[in-house]
């Protein structure tokens, strides 16, 4: 290994660091050919694949954004419809509660009126029976008084 390094140093001293002979242009031409071949065989296809992939990503993102926008619009629409349905349901519930309260108050008023009428009828009947009982009692009192009077007058004679 040391030998090869020494040979390289001797060769460099003998010919110099850069010899301006035909090797430099040949190396330059080889480099340019290599760049051209790599460009046509590797870089352009890779660039095309990368560009097509970027295009695919852009279109996919655009489609995804459109779908997201549509989904958001549908969500807003459905939320608005749900809000309307809730309002309608609340109105129906309020109307039903009002109708139930009205029916309850009507039935309560009717029941109170019926109870009041029955109570009044019972009072009248009680008053009538009281009057009848008082009249019968008065008749019995009169009859007993007449009998007592007769007995008193009959025994006094």
From Swiss-Prot:
Keywords recorded for this protein, A-Z: ATP synthesis, CF(0), Hydrogen ion transport, Ion transport, Membrane, Thylakoid, Transmembrane, Transmembrane helix, Transport
GO molecular function, one term: proton-transporting ATP synthase activity, rotational mechanism
Presence of the UniProt keyword NADP in the record: no
Subcellular location: Cellular thylakoid membrane
Pfam families, A to Z: ATP-synt_B
InterPro entries: ATP_synth_b, ATP_synth_B-like_membr_sf, ATP_synth_b/b'su_bac/chlpt, ATP_synthase_B_chain
Membrane topology: Single-pass membrane protein
Domain of life: Bacteria
Primary location group: membrane
TM annotation in the entry: 22-42
CDD domains listed in its UniProt record: ATP-synt_Fo_b
GO cellular component: plasma membrane-derived thylakoid membrane; proton-transporting ATP synthase complex
Similarity comment text for this entry: Belongs to the ATPase B chain family.
The protein's assembly and partners: F-type ATPases have 2 components, F(1) - the catalytic core - and F(0) - the membrane proton channel. F(1) has five subunits: alpha(3), beta(3), gamma(1), delta(1), epsilon(1). F(0) has four main subunits: a(1), b(1), b'(1) and c(10-14). The alpha and beta chains form an alternating ring which encloses part of the gamma chain. F(1) is attached to F(0) by a central stalk formed by the gamma and epsilon chains, while a peripheral stalk is formed by the delta, b and b' chains.
Function: F(1)F(0) ATP synthase produces ATP from ADP in the presence of a proton or sodium gradient. F-type ATPases consist of two structural domains, F(1) containing the extramembraneous catalytic core and F(0) containing the membrane proton channel, linked together by a central stalk and a peripheral stalk. During catalysis, ATP synthesis in the catalytic domain of F(1) is coupled via a rotary mechanism of the central stalk subunits to proton translocation.
Name the record gives this protein: ATP synthase subunit b'
Gene: atpF2
